[in-house]
């Protein structure tokens, strides 16, 4: 027998698959979904079960809504369970009890009320117990019924579910019908649609008709006004016409008589003509009060700007001014012709090279065409935008009778002009200034100890290795007079710093140790002082030592041109002991005496100028510069240009670290507020305002950059081979960080002077301040190591250096840096080796072994033959082969060497053509120290 699926049965019956599946389950069939298949007999049984259930569909008639929902429920549920009836019973006694509670007695008896409430609650509990008992009994009965007739209970539930679905479908159908009826009513009541195209066409036709009507009316009005005006002119008598002509002639004569005085404006004659009416259908603009005349019809009525432009254009004005249209201008007075003003020529003309003709014309108040004409007569072809040289401008001014002077342009960025200009200082304001004294001498001759004694402090004990690392500027008072001291380093690396100190000083104190005598840096200090034309006071120090010999020192100095006044020279000699404060007062008196002879003067009223003694980069303050004021007075908040930098003086401290607001001539101060750290030895100057200072500083920085670029060497035929050779050199990349700018300069110069053949030093970067992360990053990128002089790396930089394997060398003594750098440079050189013969042997017998090679039996005749040595095979005085030993044996034992007079066997690596009487020469390569 064939089978059918449930969805096929549903399709035949016109039912949903869900209903068919539910009916099959009601009939007790084991089906799961609409895809389940059943026998044809079962399918016929399912189809037959739907035939009596077709009656509920009739309820969708119009009479159905009249039946109430309660009756429908009664019909659809013919047999309600007994539990429902018993549930309705407890509701009957509730109503009378609520009525009793609602009626309140006049005097409340709370006790009676509590008793009544207690009785009510007891009755409710009894009723609930009875109901619960009945429900349990009914539930037990239902369970028994379910056990006895499970199929019947299942069919009742399915019937109820089916009835609910039928009711739901009827409600949905009813709502759909009502919705359709409402839509039909709305469609019947809606107004007819408007035909917008027809409406727009009708409106446009009405507008065109109205416009045509108004245009005709305006044209008729214009014609009527024109005819009325013509008739009025005809009516005038000839006498009136002659009177008007006479008035016009008088007015013309008055206008010609007036040349400089402008005539008063007369009111124009009243126009008796009928005024033209404006268009009634167009609003007039507020700013346009002219009247419209007759116009042709325009297609584009909405373009009001087009009409306005036509009315205000030159074309309309020209049209009005044509012949025959001048009737309106008859009574208007002509404007007087203004004469051109005459400008007198200047007596002097200050010019610069490259001025154009237009600029000259503007300055002398003449037309450029006039000047071009004069130049043409002089034989110079020029236009108004062409530049002229100074000679042509002078010839042109001679032609005009003007005295020409060339303008001298002042370079605002030139600071050095303040030091050489004669008119910068006021001779009447000059006052005596303190002397600037520089202490010079060789290393460890006692310069800083002397200065320490003068200042009563212990600066010298803090100096590393007994070397002063940078210039210090201090000021002391002796007998009520100030003396400024500059301390210079004595090491050879600080030559530039000593030269800088000599350039700003007035007196040089040359410190020479009585036990050491004249040293190389002593001679250098003498040369610097002589070059600067500075008087020298010789302080022979350490006279307290047993080996002191001042006379020898005086003789050695005389050999170098420093003669004592006792010997007929001009240098003062003072024997002192800086350590024990011996003869210090005599030295200071000598300084004041020499300063008095020099008559040192300064003008404190001008803007301050001076020199940078030292500069550094402070972590908290930024750029800090030590300045020596040479002329003028430096104040806080002064705009200043220092070298190639600029700024404003924010704070100023003296040599004791105290803040000051004013610094006079010969006063050393430290300032902050610069945008960068300047170079030591740069000049500084105070400007009028910050704007000019900024412009000068930026211009100086720009010039310095251009100069640096121009100084870059270019490859030429002369240095081409040197450049190629330099490419073969090895370089040591170094980053230098120091505490002050002078130390940076000294280190850079010293490292670049180190002469190691084949290796050169490359300064990748040098700056003032602590070693930071950017320095470590640069060192890693350029394969360099960092040299820190009197500075320390930050914690972050130290961690980064350890992570990136960057070497940081910290030093406080400059000659140790130089020695360490020399060793590093020598270590970078390729090792050089020299050949050394260690022994000779003669082959006495040869043995050929298969799969091994030729073994040579030998005897050492000189020196020794080592296993790790190289050998040469010499036959008849000619080297046949040069190689290494493969094995070396003494009898059957492997040995490291065979000494003189002994026998052994050897095999040469890669060579088997050994013959008797061959000489084996053993040698090694030894490294040569450089």
Swiss-Prot record:
Segments of this protein annotated with the region G5: 577-579
Protein name: Translation initiation factor IF-2
Binding site for GTP: 441-448, 487-491, 541-544
Keyword set includes Cytoplasm: yes
CDD domains assigned: IF2_eIF5B (cd01887), IF2_mtIF2_II (cd03702), mtIF2_IVc (cd03692)
Region span, Disordered: 50-217, 260-346
Basic and acidic residues composition-biased segments: 68-90, 110-125, 157-167, 262-295, 337-346
Keyword annotations from UniProtKB, A to Z: Cytoplasm, GTP-binding, Initiation factor, Nucleotide-binding, Protein biosynthesis
Gene that this sequence comes from: infB
G3: region residues: 487-490
InterPro entries according to UniProt: EF-G-like_DII, IF2_II, IF2_N, P-loop_NTPase, Small_GTP-bd, T_Tr_GTP-bd_dom, TF_IF2_bacterial-like, TIF_IF2
Protein's cellular compartments: Cytoplasm
Keyword Nucleotide-binding: yes
């Amino acid at each position: 027998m064939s089978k059918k699926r449930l969805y096929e049965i549903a399709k035949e019956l016109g039912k949903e698959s869900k209903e068919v599946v539910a009916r099959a389950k009601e009939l007790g069939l084991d089906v799961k979904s609409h895809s389940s298949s059943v026998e044809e007999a079962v399918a016929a049984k399912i189809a037959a079960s739907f035939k009596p259930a077709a009656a509920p569909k009739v309820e969708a008639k119009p009479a159905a809504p009249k039946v109430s929902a309660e009756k429908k429920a009664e019909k659809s549920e013919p047999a309600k369970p007994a539990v429902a009836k018993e549930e309705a019973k407890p509701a009957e006694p509730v109503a009378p009890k609520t009525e009793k509670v609602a009626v309140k007695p006049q005097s409340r008896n709370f006790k009676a009320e509590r008793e009544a409430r207690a009785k009510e609650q007891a009755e409710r509990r009894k009723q609930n117990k009875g109901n619960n008992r009945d429900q349990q009994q009914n539930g037990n009965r239902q369970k028994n019924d379910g056990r006895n007739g499970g199929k019947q209970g299942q069919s009742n539930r399915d019937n109820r579910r089916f009835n609910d679905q039928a009711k739901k479908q009827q409600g949905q159908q009813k709502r759909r019908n009502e919705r359709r009826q409402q839509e039909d009513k709305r469609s019947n009541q809606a107004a007819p649609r408007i035909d917008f195209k027809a409406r727009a066409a009708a409106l446009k036709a009405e507008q065109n008709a109205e416009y045509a009507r108004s245009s005709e009316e305006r044209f008729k009005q214009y014609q009527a006004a024109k005819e009325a005006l013509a008739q009025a002119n005809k009516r005038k008598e000839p006498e009136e016409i002659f009177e008007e002509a006479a008035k016009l002639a008088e007015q013309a004569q008055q206008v010609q008589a007036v040349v400089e005085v402008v005539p008063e404006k007369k009111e124009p004659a009243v126009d008796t003509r009928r005024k033209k009416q404006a268009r009634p259908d167009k609003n007039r603009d507020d700013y346009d009060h002219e009247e419209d005349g007759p116009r042709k019809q325009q297609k584009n009525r909405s373009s009001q700007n087009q009409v306005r432009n036509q009315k205000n254009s030159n074309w309309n004005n020209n049209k009005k001014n044509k012949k025959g249209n001048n009737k309106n201008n008859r009574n208007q007075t002509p404007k007087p012709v203004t004469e051109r003003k005459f400008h007198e020529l200047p007596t002097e003309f200050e010019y610069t090279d490259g001025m154009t003709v237009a600029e000259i014309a503007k300055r002398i108040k003449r037309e450029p065409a006039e000047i071009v004409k004069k130049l043409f007569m002089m034989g110079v072809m020029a236009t108004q935008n062409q530049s002229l040289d100074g000679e042509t401008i002078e010839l042109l001014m001679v032609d005009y009778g003007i005295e020409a002077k060339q303008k001298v342009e002042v370079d605002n960025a030139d600071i050095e002009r303040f030091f050489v200009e004669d008119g910068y200082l006021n001779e009447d304001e000059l006052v005596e200034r303190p002397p600037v004294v520089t202490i010079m001498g060789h290393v460890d001759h006692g310069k800083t100890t002397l200065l320490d004694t003068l200042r009563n402090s212990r600066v010298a004990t803090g100096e590393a290795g007994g070397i002063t690392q940078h210039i210090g500027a201090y000021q002391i008072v002796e007998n009520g007079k100030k003396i400024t001291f500059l301390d210079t380093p004595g090491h050879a690396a600080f030559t530039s710093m000593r030269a800088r100190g000599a350039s700003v000083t007035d007196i040089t104190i040359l410190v020479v140790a009585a036990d050491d005598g004249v040293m190389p840096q002593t001679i250098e200090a003498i040369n610097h002082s002589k070059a600067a034309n500075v008087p020298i006071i010789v302080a022979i120090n350490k006279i307290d030592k047993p080996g002191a010999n001042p006379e020898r020192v005086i003789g050695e100095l005389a050999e170098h041109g420093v003669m004592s006044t006792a010997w007929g020279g001009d240098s003062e000699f003072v024997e002192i002991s800086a350590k024990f404060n011996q003869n210090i007062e005599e030295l200071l008196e000598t300084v004041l005496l020499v300063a008095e002879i020099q008559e040192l003067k300064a003008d404190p009223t001008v803007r301050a100028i001076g020199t940078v003694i030292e500069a550094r980069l402070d972590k908290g303050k930024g750029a800090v510069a030590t300045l020596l004021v040479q002329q003028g007075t430096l104040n806080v908040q002064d705009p200043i240009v220092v070298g190639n930098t600029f700024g404003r003086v924010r704070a100023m401290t003296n040599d004791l670290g105290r803040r000051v607001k004013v610094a006079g001539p010969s006063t050393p101060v430290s300032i902050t507020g610069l945008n960068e750290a300047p170079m030591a030895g740069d000049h500084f100057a105070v400007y009028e305002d910050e704007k000019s200072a900024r412009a000068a500083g930026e211009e100086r920085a720009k010039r310095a950059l251009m100069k640096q670029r121009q100084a870059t060497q270019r490859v030429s035929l002369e240095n081409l081979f040197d450049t190629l050779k330099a490419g073969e050199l090895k370089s040591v990349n170094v980053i230098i960080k120091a505490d002050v700018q002078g130390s940076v300069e000294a280190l850079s110069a010293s490292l670049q002077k180190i002469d190691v053949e084949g290796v050169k030093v490359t300064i990748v970067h040098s700056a003032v301040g602590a070693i930071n992360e950017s320095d470590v990053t640069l060192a890693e990128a350029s394969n360099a190591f960092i040299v820190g002089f009197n500075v320390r790396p930050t914690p972050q930089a130290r961690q980064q250096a350890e992570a990136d394997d960057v070497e940081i060398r910290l030093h406080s003594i400059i000659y140790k840096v130089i020695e360490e750098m020399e060793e590093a440079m020598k270590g970078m050189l390729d090792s050089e080796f020299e050949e050394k013969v260690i022994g000779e042997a003669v082959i006495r017998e040869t043995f050929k072994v298969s799969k091994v090679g030729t073994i040579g039996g030998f005897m050492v005749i000189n020196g020794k033959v080592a296993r790790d040595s190289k050998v040469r095979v010499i036959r008849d005085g000619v080297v046949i082969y040069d190689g290494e030993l493969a094995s070396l044996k003494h009898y059957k034992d492997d040995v490291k060497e065979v000494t003189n007079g002994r026998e052994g066997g050897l095999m040469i690596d890669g060579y088997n053509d050994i013959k008797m009487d061959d000489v084996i020469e053993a040698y090694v390569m030894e490294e040569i120290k450089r």
